[in-house]
Curated annotation (Swiss-Prot):
One of its GO terms (cellular component) is spindle pole. Residues 116-127, 143-169 have a biased composition (Basic and acidic residues). Interacts with KATNB1 and KATNBL1. The gene is KATNAL1. It comes from the Eukaryota. The keyword Acetylation applies. It is found in: Cytoplasm, Cytoskeleton; Cytoplasm; Cytoplasm, Cytoskeleton, Spindle pole; Cytoplasm, Cytoskeleton, Spindle. This is Katanin p60 ATPase-containing subunit A-like 1. It comes from Sorex araneus.
């Protein structure tokens, strides 16, 4: 694949669009989009493939803008009056027993010609007494493409659409037109909101930014990365895990692991919370859940991260459960099970994995626990993990030569990762607090940067440890360990 040719075609498409030659611009855009699509199929590196897909998406948006401009210009050439809303208030009262005046002959619709290959029903007008009638206007036959669609028709279309057809649309996008998620059957605002607020790219958190947790990293690589590298191996009984649940006390790195998955694995990352799938309208939340999973299958390979999943799918059958929340839970369970069933014999590189995190695993519904096949414990950092966390948090700060991070790691035993970060942050501010003590605001503003860049000492950590205590109790740790002994699946 000639990369220079791709760049040249993209440049020509943009130049023709700026000059107003939209037809030539659309031809170049279609060609470069097809070239990038073929190039992505030959790329094996997930990171490089993700960057090419992002470039392809940007060109696709430009192509859609040019296409909308062309359609707008074409609409000016059509001899058709604009459709204005009919105002019934200006119409005087009409007796229903009296027929309205006939439509002028020059405004009548042309007679429809019956063709032998298809049936066309003639346009019928109800001229009987029917209450108020709008002002007399030009009548047009309603073609098949202009037929108004009702909500019932949209629901039928959405219900009849299957995931395999959607996947073929994505893979077979050789014509350059079917390159974006088709939200037919759903509200356009819902689709745009999910694409704008949920799809996250490049959170800039890497595996090296997370200390310890080697078992969790290994499992996530096995569940997300390896199926993309070895698609022929992960088939049948070796199919990828469709659900992973991370359990542990607050501040141990569950959300950071999810961000690292989004950065390192090169998959589309959906970050879902309870507010994302909540709507005040009846039945809207269930549609959001279904739309989320359909978009995930379309943009596969995809990782759906549901943080604090106990707030969305808590135990069913309790006395304080609302009917609406029960319907949302049922739809979520159906879609999660459908993910595995739809992709069981498919290409593992087109997988959809649900990655969940919770601090209250004992409140999760039993059916959801079964669908989350891997349930791993994210514990408090070990002695080595605490030392690594100190090094990561203090890598941009100057340290005193006499300070020993191993000694500090022993003092912060029982602290979570978030607690250790707070200790490092507070200790790094101690020198600045001592320097500005007793100074006026003018004197503080006059201080140079070098005067504030003082090394962090062991005494600074001692003062910070006196102010900051651990946030996880021993009783909580016992509850997590007991639950993992009973339901863990690492």
């Amino acid at each position: 694949m000639n990369l220079a040719e791709i760049c040249d075609n993209a440049k020509k498409g943009r130049e023709y669009a700026l000059l107003g030659n939209y037809d030539s611009s659309m031809v170049y855009y279609q060609g470069v989009i097809q070239q990038i699509h073929r190039h992505c199929q030959s790329v094996r590196d997930p990171a490089v493939k993700g960057k090419w897909q992002q470039v392809r998406q940007e060109l696709l948006e430009e192509y859609e803008q040019v296409k909308s401009i062309v359609s707008t210009l074409e609409s000016f050439k059509i001899d058709k009056p604009p459709d204005f809303p009919v105002s019934y208030q200006d119409e005087p009262f009409r007796d229903p027993a009296v027929w309205p005046p006939p439509v002028p002959a020059e405004h009548r619709a042309p007679p429809q010609i019956r063709r032998p290959n298809r049936e066309v029903r003639p346009l019928r007008k109800d001229v009987a007494g029917v209450g108020a009638r709008g002002p007399v206007g030009r009548a047009h036959p309603i073609s098949k493409s202009e037929k108004p669609s009702t909500n019932k028709d949209k629901d039928y279309r959405a219900r009849g659409r299957d995931d395999k057809g959607r996947k073929n649309m994505q893979d077979g996008a050789s014509d350059g037109d079917i390159l974006k998620f088709d939200g037919a059957g759903y509200d356009k605002d819902l689709v745009e909101a999910l694409e704008r607020d949920i799809v996250s790219r490049n959170p800039s958190i890497h595996w090296d930014d997370i200390a310890d947790l080697e078992e969790a990293k290994k499992l996530l690589r096995e569940a997300v990365v390896l199926p993309m590298w070895m698609p022929d191996f992960f088939k049948g009984i070796r199919r990828p895990w469709k659900g992973v649940l991370m359990v542990g006390p607050p501040g141990t790195g569950k959300t950071m692991l999810a961000k690292a998955v989004a950065t390192e694995c090169g998959t589309t990352f959906f970050n879902v919370s309870s507010s994302t799938l909540t709507s005040k309208y009846r039945g809207e939340s269930e549609k959001l859940v279904r739309l989320l999973f359909e978009m995930a299958r379309f943009y596969a390979p995809t990782t759906i991260f549901i943080d604090e999943i106990d707030s969305i799918c808590s135990r069913r059958g309790t006395s304080d459960e609302h009917e609406a929340s029960r319907r949302v839970k049922s739809e979520l369970l159906i879609q999660m099970d459908g993910v595995g069933g739809a992709l069981e014999n498919d290409d593992p590189s087109k997988m959809v994995m649900v990655l969940a995190a919770t601090n209250f695993p004992w409140d999760i519904d039993e059916a959801l626990r079964r669908r989350l096949e891997k349930r791993i414990y994210i514990p408090l950092p070990t002695a080595k993990g605490r030392t690594d966390l100190l090094k990561i948090n203090l890598r941009e700060v100057e340290l005193d030569p006499d300070i020993q991070l191993e000694d500090i790691a022993e003092k912060i035993e029982g602290y979570s990762g978030a607690d250790i970060t707070n200790v490092c942050r507070d200790a790094s501010l101690m020198a600045m607090r001592r320097r500005i003590n007793g100074l006026s605001p003018e004197e503080i503003r006059a201080l140079s940067k070098e005067e504030l860049q003082m090394p962090v000492t062991k005494g600074d950590f001692d003062l910070a440890l006196k102010k900051i205590a651990k946030s996880v109790s021993d009783a909580d740790l016992e509850k997590y360990e007991k639950w993992m002994t009973e339901f863990g699946s690492a």
